[in-house]
Amino acid sequence: MSEFTHFDESGRAIMVDVAGKDDTRRVATARGAIHMLPDTLGRILGGQAAKGDVLAVARIAAIQATKRTADLIPLCHPIALTRVVVDFAPETEVSRIVCTVTAETVGKTGVEMEALTGVSVALLTIYDMCKAVDRGMQIGDIQLVEKQGGRSGHWRLPD
């Protein structure tokens, strides 16, 4: 098993030194879901939310969050993102919306945290925009789905 990388030999928190790493293309995809009442999902999909186009605002929030990850997660490196893609998949049969975020860069460290932060903020934005009609919404299942690049190479969540 690997060791934790964000602690020194004394157990103090550190920012990992990436100076000796090569710049490589790095891609990470994360996903998560928000469960809601069927009526809430219907309002979102029908464009009937009082605050506007919920998914358009959540998409912009996700992109903005990926760019601000280092400001939110203390030991993350600021990363120059080259691409961010945000997708939403409504699942009416289970009354939820699945959000997937893919982040890319060419750099010395991965973009897993950026993708995970993007998903989290997108789902929080949906909650914020719809809480007036459904305070019982549940956010969950947030996880890394795939990462590529760097020393550890390619990893994919098992099916």
From Swiss-Prot:
Substrate binds at L75, C76, H77, M113, E114. GO terms for molecular function: cyclic pyranopterin monophosphate synthase activity. The active site is at D128. It comes from the Bacteria. It catalyses: (8S)-3',8-cyclo-7,8-dihydroguanosine 5'-triphosphate = cyclic pyranopterin phosphate + diphosphate. Its EC number is 4.6.1.17. Pathway: Cofactor biosynthesis; molybdopterin biosynthesis. Keywords: Lyase, Molybdenum cofactor biosynthesis. GO terms for biological process: Mo-molybdopterin cofactor biosynthetic process. It is an enzyme of class 4 (lyase). PANTHER family: CYCLIC PYRANOPTERIN MONOPHOSPHATE SYNTHASE (PTHR22960:SF29), MOLYBDOPTERIN COFACTOR SYNTHESIS PROTEIN A (PTHR22960). Belongs to the MoaC family. Homohexamer; trimer of dimers. This is Cyclic pyranopterin monophosphate synthase. It comes from Thiobacillus denitrificans (strain ATCC 25259 / T1). The lineage of its organism: Bacteria, Pseudomonadati, Pseudomonadota, Betaproteobacteria, Nitrosomonadales.
